[in-house]
């Protein structure tokens, strides 16, 4: 979306929006650089790194160089905090999204940032779903809020592996603070969730894959925060089935439990995903976890298993503390909302240059991501405005989608 090509009202909203978010920055030079950078990320051009954005900002070579250096300073050296900027953007978008329905889910996942060299903070050979294999990359963990209509990414943290944390010289070269590094991805996710709770963003059911949900400490902390969750666990997770009389069965893996009750799976169809309606055979039962390390989770929870027709093994195992009387269809719809985080990654990378940052600074990476989140929040709010209460897209909304 090229800001210069917006209709008058949308352009005015964009300018006012930048002013609103800019209040969280310390001085007018930061606010000016912030506006330039945000306009560059939202603007035309296939490459959203600093040099080409500076070139598009001015046809004068001398001025282009000055803009480029100003943007480098803004991202890498200027002292401003990411959290207030991200929170202000999240509130702006959430206010508009909730006109069309309450926030219903908080989605946790991570995405890869492919790299060539070894000096970008956190880079190493590691698995990323972005490539579908191990690759030289950085990993960013994110939190996305979503309702029935749309999604808004509100926070991101760069994963710094233990191999980096053990090399403080390397960390200092990448401007990684001394107290950062070695945290697991699920711990980074909890940091973001706790911040969202503290800033009183509207709550939703926490969704996550097994990289997060399999960890008992992750689930226990969600429960302590008073958050509902429906998270994937691995097939070797040990549980005890709760019988109709309340008695507990022997500890067994969820995979073995699925095979023991294969005749009880039922066909189900739930909401649209990225590739159309989601269908599968599912089984739901009450269980307690058999992990003695997390005794607080000894209360009954739902185990939801998906086993597609014709496949040798079940595909997903979901553990949830959602209410006991929740209808199966409602639970399936909630769990099916996790695909929205993938769409946010597609838009952040495809439209807003999320993975175009070429600097080698931990602070710079987070500053770049913050401005990308600000831009996404504006787009999300504009898209929400383009829908009438009955769910039809207005002419202005179609124009905005075409321009995006």
Language-model regions: role of each:
Residues 41-45, 57, 75-78, 322, ...:
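Generic structural signal for hydrophobic core residues of well-folded globular domains
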Residues 379-404:
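Conserved nucleotidyltransferase catalytic core and NTase-mimicking acidic/glycine-rich helix/loop elements
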Residues 342, 374:
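Hydrophobic, well-ordered secondary-structure elements that form the walls
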Residues 217, 320, 326-335, 350-366, ...:
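Short, solvent-exposed helix-loop connector elements
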Residues 118, 345-352:
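Active-site-adjacent bridging/hinge elements
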Residues 1-207, 211-231, 235-238, 245, ...:
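Conserved, well-structured functional cores that handle cations and Mg-NTP chemistry
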Residues 149-174, 178, 230-340:
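An anionic, glycine-rich sequence signature occurring as long contiguous blocks
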């Amino acid at each position: 979306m090229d800001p210069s090509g917006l209709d008058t009202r949308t352009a005015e909203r964009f300018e006012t929006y930048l002013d609103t978010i800019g209040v969280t920055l310390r001085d007018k030079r930061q606010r000016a650089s912030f506006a330039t950078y945000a306009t560059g990320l939202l603007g035309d051009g296939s490459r959203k790194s600093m040099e080409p954005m500076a070139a598009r900002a001015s046809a004068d070579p001398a001025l282009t160089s000055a803009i480029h250096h100003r943007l480098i300073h803004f991202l890498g050296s200027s002292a401003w905090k990411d959290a207030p900027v991200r929170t202000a953007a999240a509130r702006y978008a959430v206010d508009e999204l909730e006109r069309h329905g309450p926030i219903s889910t908080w989605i946790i996942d991570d995405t890869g940032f492919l790299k060539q060299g070894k000096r970008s903070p956190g880079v190493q050979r590691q698995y990323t779903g972005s490539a579908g294999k191990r690759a030289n990359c950085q990993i960013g963990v994110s939190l996305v809020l979503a309702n029935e209509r749309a999604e808004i990414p509100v926070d991101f943290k760069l994963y710094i592996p233990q191999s980096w944390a053990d090399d403080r010289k390397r960390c200092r070269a990448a401007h990684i603070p001394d107290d950062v590094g070695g945290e697991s991805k699920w711990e980074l996710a909890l940091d973001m969730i706790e911040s969202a709770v503290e800033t009183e963003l509207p709550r939703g059911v926490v969704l996550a894959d097994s990289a997060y949900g399999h960890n008992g400490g992750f689930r226990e902390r969600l429960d302590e925060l008073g958050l509902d969750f429906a998270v994937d666990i691995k097939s070797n997770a040990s549980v005890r089935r709760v019988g109709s009389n309340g008695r507990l069965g022997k500890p067994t893996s969820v995979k073995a439990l699925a095979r023991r009750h294969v005749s009880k799976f039922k066909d189900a169809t739930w909401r649209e995903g990225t590739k159309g309606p989601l269908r599968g055979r599912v089984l739901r039962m009450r269980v307690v976890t058999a992990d003695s390390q997390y005794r607080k989770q000894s209360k009954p929870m739902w185990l939801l298993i998906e086993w597609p027709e014709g496949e040798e093994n079940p595909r997903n195992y979901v553990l949830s503390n959602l209410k006991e009387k929740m209808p199966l269809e409602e639970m399936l719809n909630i769990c099916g909302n996790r695909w929205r985080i993938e769409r946010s990654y597609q838009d952040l990378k495809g439209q807003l240059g999320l993975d175009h940052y070429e600097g080698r600074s931990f602070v710079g990476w987070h500053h770049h991501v913050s401005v990308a989140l600000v831009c996404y929040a504006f787009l999300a709010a504009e898209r929400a405005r383009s829908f009438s209460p009955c769910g039809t897209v207005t002419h202005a909304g179609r124009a905005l989608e075409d321009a995006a």
